[in-house]
Amino acid sequence: MMRKPYHCLRSLGTALTLLLLPSLSSSPLLAQSSENVCRIGLHYKVLGEGTNSKSIPVLTVVQPFGPAAVGGFFPGDLITQIDGVPTTGLTKQQISELLASPVGEHLLTIVRIGSGTTARILRPSCKAPYALTERELATAFSGYSPMDQAKQQRTLSFSFESSAPFDWSQAKTFAFAPSEGEHRDLYDIVYGQIAGLLEARGLTQQANSPDLILECSRSDAEGGARLSLQVTSPSKLNQTLWSGTSSLPKGTKEAQLYARQAIPVMLQSFPYLTASQVGYTEQTSRYLYTGILYDSRDLSRIVDVEEGSPAFTAGLRVGDKVLRINGKPLSPTTVRELSSRYRNFLDETYRYRSAEAVRPEQAPWKSSDYGSIRKALEKDKYASVFSYLFFFRPYINETEQTELIFEIERHSETYTLSIAPVLRDETVFIPQ
């Protein structure tokens, strides 16, 4: 295969600059203060916006490991107040402005199924504008492992209905209808998924006198197999409080695997309806986390180490200079030069990609060429030191050992530290 010239990758400098731009939208993940870039880690929709004065925001996505997740927030939480300001009737822009205000913490009053009304603290995660997190670097160097860094539009065949008014804040317990028939194994998998999700939100599973009854059913229609989840109340058995329906693959094993993946997405906004049918943006992000923040002005400089992180535990501190990671020198240290080396790597290893893609770095690697990819990554001319973020993949590391060896300089002395990174999967499905 002829080497395809690399033309369409943005420079790493541009990519990193874009990553640091303030982002303030109707569903904010970032907030911006005058000095720092602050991350909130949540997405929301406004129920009833533009239809009446009782519109209210509901969380649709909580970013794994983000501030909202640390603060104990869950998808499906209704936000009734932000720092004492009622959210009823506010627009998306007004809610964004409240969440983006430059404060050390926000007090959010929420209504949650199973828990009623509670108040929780949301502490934004802030960093200097020149600080680069490993999350940002994994995105910038996505070509090392495209299967772990991707963003795509997904049409998941979900449909939702809600036909009876119900005070969900008063629901404390739930039970499942008996699993029977030839699809019992599928129902058991689905019920197990649902139980974990509902219990995490504060509901209790009990067989006697539950507040909610959940029942799964599989059906075959002209368009293919469908899986339906129906929620009723013993006091209103003839009325469906909430229902969700999804398509299913034909094979039994395929259907069970799909159910494991789809049910958490289907229940993201449960028990509220943000739309009858929903499209999603799938943001895939997996990388090895140590907790280091690098200086974009000199990438070898550590500008912060998250407290309690693997790097902090290993002894790395602010001001340390990283010389090598797993034997690879952290050089060059400028974004511009490192970008040039990275582009050369993508261009000169394109023959190892297994498929065409809109951007070459998005195509996966051929499994038969993993050895060649590892050899290329060892070449100093490519300066692939940040491939450590994907050290859990066989085309980066042929062993199962993910320990990272950092050689650092501190006060003119050289030290070698061993760090046990944590594999983070921050993949989310964001409803459009």
Task: Give the residues covered by each predicted segment.
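Second-shell loop/turn segments in exported
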Residues: 64-65, 83-84, 175-186, 202, ...
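A structural "domain/chain start" motif
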Residues: 42, 50-55, 71, 130-189, ...
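PDZ-domain C-terminal substructure recognizer with occasional recognition of PDZ-binding tails
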Residues: 30-36, 45, 95-139, 339-428
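Amphipathic beta-strand/beta-sheet edge segments enriched in Tyr/Trp
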Residues: 218-257
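N-terminal segment of the mature soluble domain
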Residues: 170-218, 338
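PDZ/PDZ-like peptide-tail recognition elements
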Residues: 29-61, 97-98, 130-147, 256-306, ...
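Conserved PDZ fold ligand-binding element
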Residues: 68-90, 313-339, 346-350, 373-377
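Bacterial N-terminal signal peptides that target proteins for export
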Residues: 2-16, 25
